Amino acid sequence: IGLASSKPEKSCERILEHFGILDMFDEVVGATFDGRIDTKEEVLNEVMRRWSDIPRDEMCLIGDTMFDIEGANRVNVPSIAVSFGFGDVNEMVSAGAKAVIDDLRQLPDVLSRLFD
């Protein structure tokens, strides 16, 4: 499991560490302070670079804004919207989310349907 954020990577790591969940993630990818990686698309491309051994068609983005969904579309990765985040569900569906979940416990079933 990886975290891909448009927020600075080091900030993401500190937040995850603060909540004691950093070790739950195999990779944390975020924006760079030098501006080299800034947009969601650039962050996701960096994920693809770091995880080059994983086929893109085996990846999925779980997001809470239309920007997450649009970024996933730009790198040809399916996306699942969560209804309990910051974004509007209708905007995420319009942007192309393949599914919407209201609870993380729904994720295994939705992933099974998407990848079967």
Can you name each region flagged by the protein language model?
Residues I1-L16:
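Substrate-recognition element of Asp-dependent hydrolases with the DxDx(T/V) motif
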Residues S11, V43-L44, D88, G96:
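Hydrophobic alpha-helical segments typical of transmembrane helices
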Residues S11-R14, G71, E91, D109-V110:
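Phosphate- and divalent-cation-binding pockets in alpha/beta enzyme and binding domains
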Residues G20-M24, S52-I54:
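Short helix-capping segments at alpha-helix termini
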Residues L22-I37:
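A short, structured active-site edge motif that brings together acidic residues
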Residues K40-G71:
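Conserved Lys-Pro-Asp/Glu-containing loop-to-beta segment of HAD-superfamily phosphomonoesterases
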Residues L61-I101:
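Acidic, Mg2+-coordinating phosphoryl-transfer loop and its flanking beta/alpha structural elements
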Residues V110-D116:
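Short amphipathic alpha-helix with an adjacent loop that forms part of the alpha/beta core around
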